[in-house]
Amino acid sequence: MFLFRGGLDPQTASPEEMQNNMQKWMGWVDDLKKKGIYTAGEALLPSGKTLHKGGIATDGPFAETKEVIGGFFIIQAQDMEAALSIAGDCPDFAFGGTVEVRDVMVF
């Protein structure tokens, strides 16, 4: 699983930068699909709710923009090294973004 943080800020990016970045993302996704390693992925809205014991929901979590999880991918990789190599092509690195790479435990 890839968790994406940071990257191009839509609040400050020009329309041209946004369009160019989206084309790079779509090209990357298309490449992963052609290789048969892309399973799923979505962008996430910047805010949500946190549910606590007793059914209490609070706004948040709140974090600095660079810490917000902006989206995720589920991919198929042989091992962590292969997953890191795949993540290395993420378009958001050009804008200071990061990719957290995690194994998913299958039950």
Regions found by a protein language model. Give the residues of each.
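Conserved, structured core segments of small domains
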Residues: 1-107
